[in-house]
Amino acid sequence: MSVADIKKSEVVAQFARGTNDTGSPEVQVALLTARIVELTGHFKTHAKDHHSRRGLLRMVSRRRKLLDYLKGKDADRYRALIEKLGLRK
């Protein structure tokens, strides 16, 4: 297993709603957040990497859409996830 796989399985285990849960909005948002944090660090040293920046913006947009979906579906789960991940809003 690579480092990314180990980190991914840790995130899934931490945010899963059940034993085999990998697709719930909470897990998807947590995985996107981990990737966003990783890419943000990359841009501190590679400021002109515009190709990756476009990918980062897509991830941020996708995370925002998933959070909006979760907020409309179950506001309590939304608030708990925002607090647990330390996101604004």
Swiss-Prot record:
The residue ranges crossing the membrane are: none
Q: Which InterPro entries match?
A: Ribosomal_uS15, Ribosomal_uS15_bac-type, uS15_NS1_RNA-bd_sf
What Pfam families does the entry give?
Ribosomal_S15
Q: Which SMART domains match?
A: Ribosomal_S15 (SM01387)
Query: Can you list the disulfide-bonded cysteine pairs?
Result: none
In the UniProt record, which is one GO cellular component term? cytosolic small ribosomal subunit
Q: Name one GO molecular function term.
A: rRNA binding
**What GO biological process terms are annotated to this protein in UniProt?**
translation
Annotated function: One of the primary rRNA binding proteins, it binds directly to 16S rRNA where it helps nucleate assembly of the platform of the 30S subunit by binding and bridging several RNA helices of the 16S rRNA. Forms an intersubunit bridge (bridge B4) with the 23S rRNA of the 50S subunit in the ribosome.
Protein name as catalogued: Small ribosomal subunit protein uS15
Q: Which organism is it from?
A: Burkholderia multivorans (strain ATCC 17616 / 249)
* Encoding gene per record: rpsO
